Amino acid sequence: MSDHLTSYDVIVIGGGHAGCEAAEASARMGARTALVTHHFATIGAMSCNPAIGGLGKGHLVREVDALDGLMGRVADAGGIQFRVLNRRKGPAVRGPRAQADRKLYAAAMQAAIRETANLTVVEGEADQLIVADGQITGLRLADGRPLACGAIVITTGTFLRGLIHLGEKTWPAGRVGEAPALGLSQSLEAIGFRLGRLKTGTPPRLDGTTIDWSAVEMQPGDDPPEPFSVLTQTITTPQIQCGITRTTTATHDVIRANVHRSPMYSGQIKSTGPRYCPSVEDKIVRFGDRDGHQIFLEPEGLDDTTVYPNGISTSLPEEVQLALLPTIPGLERVRMIRPGYAIEYDHVDPRELEPTLQTKRMRGLFLAGQINGTTGYEEAAAQGLVAGLNAALTAGGGEPIVFDRADGYVGVMIDDLVTRGITEPYRMFTSRAEYRLTLRADNADQRLTDKGIALGCVGGDRARFHRTKMDALEAARSLARSVTITPNEAAKYGLTLNRDGQRRSAFELMAYPEIGFSEVRGIWPELGTIGPAIAVHLEIDAKYDVYVRRQSEDVDAFRRDEGLVLGDIDYALVPGLSNEARAKLTAARPWTIGQAGRIDGMTPAALGILAAYLRREARRSKAMV
């Protein structure tokens, strides 16, 4: 961390998952950066579940790591149970996940922030954006201190006019025990942003010493654990098991008898919650025919007896929560440390953003995380990284970076947000990516690290490691393609191939479902020189090779459309557009022809007119030179 200043290139508001990535990325790019947060001690706090990664989300963590972000390394330092979800399925849809020790995770994040050059942590409450001539010029804190800057990244999470609901009770808070951010919402509204409201929730916290662990199914992690970061060689933190139990019909009876007291059903909460992380009362109402719902009992730390019961998020009154817990196997005598609650907060329509995460309405203002309508630590971290990089580039007068849908899940997420907007908190899934065969968690560094090196956001250690790894992988591919065998020769090793007389390489053989690296190494001992980690990549590459080559044609077509940049076109001057198309384009302000095509109701004819207009304008500009 740097000494305290009053003038910065970039100011990041909020020390959560988006804010930490934004601040560190900005500072890594050489920008003098301030991270404004209420208290240094809350930096990196895991407000809800003590876990990182999962399906779709694990891809985002790997992509953050590939661009030298923090989350992967910090999760590796704090992880106490690692599992790859969907391991029985193909690599494209596998999701690395880690259960984390809250204290270890926060300590590792705080250490990383403390050690970052060009970065100052400013303790205080962000209150008012300072604007001049349509450009962000600074920030005023609640105590009156002004901070000058060239760009601001807002990453306020659930703090924007946060309001906690617990049964009939409500009180203003950003999360339990912490004050909300009120002035920033007013400042955004004064600029012209229309704010919406979203809702999320969290389950009660339990005393693990009062759980009957013998009555629940125990779930161990993977052995050996698979880290998130390519820079993590081994996981040295002790590993734990989690428990699995279920709600019962008795649980459901308690909830049904009291559902009218839930803020979601009493009318007290009118905002929308996350579809894929419903409250337990939502589950009972929406899936009334189910006789039980799974609950994961997740320890919150190695030296902490607190347990997070993943699956029973609720805002029912405290006494109702106390009544429903003993109806769950293993929790008959459990002590509740803290009740669950729901929280409502402000958000901005993400269609107000460019793909750089800069707002269209105000130059120099970037938004990342839950303020954009997303839910989840990983979604926030990935947005924070992109916003931080672009804030630094903007403040320094550079060209912004855009990650598209073929680059990674981070590009898919941002494109979904800025093109389609949200009607509920957005969560990442592998199903959202049309190029998921190439956007795998295992190849995030192969897709993005070279881009990061060219951009200047990847440090020397990672760059050297990456080049060494890529050289080794290319050598392994060459070796695997250089050794060949005929069907008759393969039969001697127990392999059944089409007897067409064609010689097949080791690389081609690994494309067969029943043939892996161990089988081809048994035929060609020289393949034994390939290290285990590289061998895993080599086998996955071989399995997907034909499909990836086929999908690359789709990616090329996509990139051609993405290469046609619309910029600040006045759509009133484009002849031939229908009034409907003109209105939609003017409202959405798409970045490229490709993005315009993803606007609901946009026709191929309208896209053809736009492409023809761009070509005419390009010829006209060239003729004038």
Swiss-Prot record:
User: What does the record give under GO molecular function?
Assistant: flavin adenine dinucleotide binding
**Do you know which SUPFAM superfamilies this protein is assigned to?**
FAD/NAD(P)-binding domain
> Binding positions for NAD(+)?
273-287
Entry cofactors = FAD
Pfam families in the record, alphabetically? GIDA, GIDA_C_1st, SAM_GIDA_C
Localization (cell): Cytoplasm
Q: Which HAMAP family match?
A: MnmG_GidA
What is the name of the protein in this document? tRNA uridine 5-carboxymethylaminomethyl modification enzyme MnmG
Keywords carried by this UniProt record: Cytoplasm, FAD, Flavoprotein, NAD, tRNA processing
Q: Which family does it belong to?
A: Belongs to the MnmG family.
Which GO cellular component term is one of those annotated?
cytosol
Give the record's subunit note: Homodimer. Heterotetramer of two MnmE and two MnmG subunits.
Q: What does this protein do?
A: NAD-binding protein involved in the addition of a carboxymethylaminomethyl (cmnm) group at the wobble position (U34) of certain tRNAs, forming tRNA-cmnm(5)s(2)U34.
Which SMART domains is this protein grouped with? GIDA_assoc_3
Provide a GO biological process annotation.
tRNA methylation
Q: What is its main location?
A: cytoplasm
